[in-house]
């Protein structure tokens, strides 16, 4: 730990005695670093040690004298005068010499001396920083208000009244501010400061930003410090770059940042972009990250992404050698076969270092279980593909391995890869067809595989089945509807929504193509299945009915009374509850999801960004849930007392059933939002409720194979005594 770090720790902890002791030691340094001394003094100034240090601040003067001329030397002197409390002749002489040398002959020079206390020398603490501030107070210069008014432009100054007139970006009218208040709340900004350019010349800065994206980000980081991608967007979007152009502009900027060396990119969206003062080579940045990494798996990931994103760097022989050495020097446990394999794959497949450890003999020595375990512990998809290519080339059981991945992987990229490999092997085609047809007969066995292949088949991208074979298409379509019905209330319900989105997309194009020339029995079954799928709205069902009628006009005679079923009955309590749920989805969850997407997008490389993909999938789910719920609310009708009739069984009725042995069962029939089977409240759409609808007193109802007579029909309002 160097002096700066040690002193900062002591300042933060308020250890005055230890600080003064270490400071005394620091003062004996032969070499003084101006930037380091500035940081120490600024830390002291903002701490509880400021008044104590002010009594010995004269010890800084010899250090100040050793600093070369420049900004750091001027800043150290300002801080000395800010901290001093003695107002001694030595400090007075140093201060007056400084202002005479820097500002003599400037307008209002003598008035400024009087304002800061350098005319009479009685109290001139803060004199230099305040004098610099007053010399900055010229019309057209810029300041920043620390109290929330933002950037301001100086419109006028009066030394007689000791006031300055400033127009702020966040205030409607210009403000008169006294010098005393200005000293405490305003910070001067140079003309080339990011905030000055953004406020003073927005059109010119926008044009500059569009032509020079990386330079603008550098200016922002230089003047405002390290920023995350989200914070960079907050500073630029609409204020510099129009929101409509933001995504394209930011993607371009990130690409250039990645190729450049002045800005160090973060490893995840929550970390900031940092401007490197001296610039750091790509290899230097990688070496820094490798030095901070705590485990070999993370180091392998860093090296892989370096090779992938900056492949042109490999033309440099020294860089290639450094990467090889970094991989060979990795501390990998002998038993960690997966990490060893990943390292060897990077060396052989990406860096051209052929190693005998992953030759034909090694691949053939692996069992099927060994191969699966190695893949499970290999997070980088590209390395998985490289390994599988070797398995395909040398292993006798490659088909089994590839088929298992096809069935169980959650990565669409990997599923596409193994599917194409199997499909391109003539001896495996029939096995592949059989497996996919099995998935159509039992889609719940491998739900993700079924949905993935159904979409591929519907788009004629499978390259396996004859696109003219409508029977295969219809088999999968029928299975898709069964699947949608089965998954509606399971953890796989999002897959059902995905199928629904596909089937109704492009004006039901997939459905129209699949049912072309279909038989009447098939279409009847299709329409029946569609009514069981909760994902389909009433308008969807109407469209499906119309599409089927185009293929088989006789279906018009069998047209179900969809219009009568269109109403969704609800109690007023459930209606209010569902409206509140919709408002929560639209007002909170969608906003939170938008933030998740932006945070995940911010790194720019979306190819293997799982967080970004998950956030997009969540957005699609939320949008679909909002669409379905909005449609249901539009169809909803609140059940009232005058709408319930007890001459026959209908919605809003409580039905008493009596068996042959005298046993009594009671059911209440309400809409789907109010259904509660545990309390014997049936949904109007349930099979049992449908069997009872329209029946009258003494009519027979079959329940679990037994006959029951309807002994009583009453309104739910009679039950409540209303």
From Swiss-Prot:
Among InterPro entries, the record links this protein to: GreA/GreB_C_sf (IPR036953), TF_GreA/GreB_CS (IPR018151), Tscrpt_elong_fac_GreA (IPR006359), Tscrpt_elong_fac_GreA/B (IPR028624), Tscrpt_elong_fac_GreA/B_C (IPR001437), Tscrpt_elong_fac_GreA/B_fam (IPR023459), Tscrpt_elong_fac_GreA/B_N (IPR022691), Tscrpt_elong_fac_GreA/B_N_sf (IPR036805)
Identify the residues that the record assigns to the GRAD1 domain, covering every copy. Answer: 1-504
Q: Where is this region: GREA?
A: 565-722
Coiled-coil stretches:
606-643
* Biological process annotations from GO: DNA-templated transcription elongation; regulation of DNA-templated transcription elongation
| One GO MF term | RNA polymerase binding
Q: What residues form the membrane-spanning segments?
A: none
Task: Tell me the domain of life.
Answer: Bacteria
Claim: Transcription regulation is one of the keywords in the record: yes
By its UniProt entry, which SUPFAM superfamilies does this protein fall under?
A: FKBP-like, GreA transcript cleavage protein, N-terminal domain
Question: Keywords, A to Z?
Answer: Coiled coil, DNA-binding, Transcription, Transcription regulation
* Family listed: Belongs to the GreA/GreB family.
> What job does this protein perform?
Necessary for efficient RNA polymerase transcription elongation past template-encoded arresting sites. The arresting sites in DNA have the property of trapping a certain fraction of elongating RNA polymerases that pass through, resulting in locked ternary complexes. Cleavage of the nascent transcript by cleavage factors such as GreA or GreB allows the resumption of elongation from the new 3'terminus. GreA releases sequences of 2 to 3 nucleotides.
Checking NCBIfam families in the record gives: greA (TIGR01462), PRK06330.1 (NF004969)
UniProt-recorded name of the protein: Transcription elongation factor GreA
This protein's gene is called greA
């Amino acid at each position: 730990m160097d002096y700066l770090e040690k002193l900062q720790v002591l300042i933060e902890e308020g250890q005055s005695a230890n600080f003064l002791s270490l400071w005394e030691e620091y003062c004996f340094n032969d070499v003084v670093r101006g930037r380091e001394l500035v940081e120490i003094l600024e830390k002291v100034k903002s701490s509880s040690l400021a008044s104590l240090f002010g009594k010995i601040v004269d010890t800084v003067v010899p250090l100040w004298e050793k600093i070369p001329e420049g900004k750091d030397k001027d800043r150290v002197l300002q801080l000395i005068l800010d901290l001093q409390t003695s107002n001694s002749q030595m400090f007075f002489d140093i201060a007056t010499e400084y202002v005479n040398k820097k500002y003599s002959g400037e307008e209002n020079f003598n008035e400024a001396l009087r304002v800061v206390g350098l005319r009479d020398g009685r109290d001139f603490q803060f004199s230099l920083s305040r004098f610099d501030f007053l010399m900055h107070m010229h019309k057209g210069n810029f300041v920043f208000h620390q109290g929330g008014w933002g950037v301001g432009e100086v419109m006028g100054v009066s030394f007689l009244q000791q006031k300055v007139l400033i127009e702020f970006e966040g205030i409607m009218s210009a403000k008169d501010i006294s010098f005393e208040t200005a000293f405490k709340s305003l910070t001067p900004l140079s003309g080339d400061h990011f905030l000055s350019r953004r406020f003073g010349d927005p059109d010119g800065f926008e044009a500059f930003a569009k032509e020079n994206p990386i330079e603008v980000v550098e200016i922002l980081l230089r003047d405002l410090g390290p920023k995350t991608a989200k914070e960079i967007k907050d500073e630029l979007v609409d204020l510099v770059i129009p929101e409509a152009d933001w995504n394209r502009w930011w993607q371009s900027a990130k690409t250039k940042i990645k190729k450049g060396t002045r800005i160090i990119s973060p490893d995840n969206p929550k970390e900031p972009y940092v401007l490197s003062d001296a610039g750091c080579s790509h290899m230097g940045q990688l070496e820094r990250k490798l030095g901070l990494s705590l485990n070999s798996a993370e180091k392998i990931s860093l090296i892989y992404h370096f090779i992938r994103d900056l492949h042109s760097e490999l033309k440099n022989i020294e860089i290639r050698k450094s990467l090889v050495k970094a991989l060979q020097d990795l501390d990998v446990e002998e038993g960690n076969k997966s990490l060893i394999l990943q390292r060897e794959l990077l060396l052989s497949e990406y860096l051209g270092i052929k190693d005998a450890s992953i030759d034909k003999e090694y691949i053939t020595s692996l069992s099927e279980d060994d191969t699966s375990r190695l893949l499970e512990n290999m997070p980088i998809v590209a390395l998985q593909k490289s390994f599988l290519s070797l398995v395909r080339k040398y292993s006798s059981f490659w088909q089994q391995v590839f088929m298992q991945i096809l069935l169980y992987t959650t990565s669409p990229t990997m599923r596409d890869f193994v599917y194409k490999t199997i499909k391109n092997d003539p001896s495996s085609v029939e096995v592949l067809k059989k497996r996919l047809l099995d998935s159509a007969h039992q889609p719940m066995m491998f739900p993700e595989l079924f949905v993935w292949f159904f979409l591929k088949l519907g788009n004629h991208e499978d390259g396996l089945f004859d696109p003219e074979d409508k029977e295969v298409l219809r088999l999968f379509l029928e299975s898709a509807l069964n699947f949608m019905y089965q998954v509606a209330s399971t953890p796989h319900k999002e897959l059902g929504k995905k199928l629904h989105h596909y089937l109704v997309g492009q004006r039901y194009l997939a459905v129209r193509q699949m049912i072309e020339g279909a038989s009447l029995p098939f279409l009847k079954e299709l329409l029946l299945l569609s009514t069981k799928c909760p994902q389909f709205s009433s308008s969807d069902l109407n469209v499906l009915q119309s599409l089927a009628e185009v293929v088989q006009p006789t279906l018009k005679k069998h047209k179900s009374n969809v219009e009568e079923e269109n109403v969704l009955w609800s109690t007023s309590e459930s209606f209010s509850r569902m409206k509140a749920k919709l408002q929560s989805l639209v007002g909170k969850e969608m906003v939170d999801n938008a933030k998740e997407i932006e945070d995940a997008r911010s790194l720019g490389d979306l190819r293997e960004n799982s967080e970004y993909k998950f956030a997009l999938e969540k957005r699609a789910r939320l949008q679909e849930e909002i669409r379905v719920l909005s449609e249901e609310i539009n169809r909803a009708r609140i059940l009232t007392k005058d709408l319930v009739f007890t001459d026959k069984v209908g919605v809003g009725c409580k039905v008493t059933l009596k068996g042959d042995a005298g046993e009594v069962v009671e059911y209440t029939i309400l809409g789907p939002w109010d259904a509660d089977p545990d309390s014997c409240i049936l949904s109007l759409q349930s099979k049992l409720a449908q069997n009872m609808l329209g029946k009258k007193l003494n009519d027979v109802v079959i329940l679990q194979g037994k006959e029951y007579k309807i002994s009583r029909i009453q309104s739910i309002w009679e039950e409540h005594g209303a």
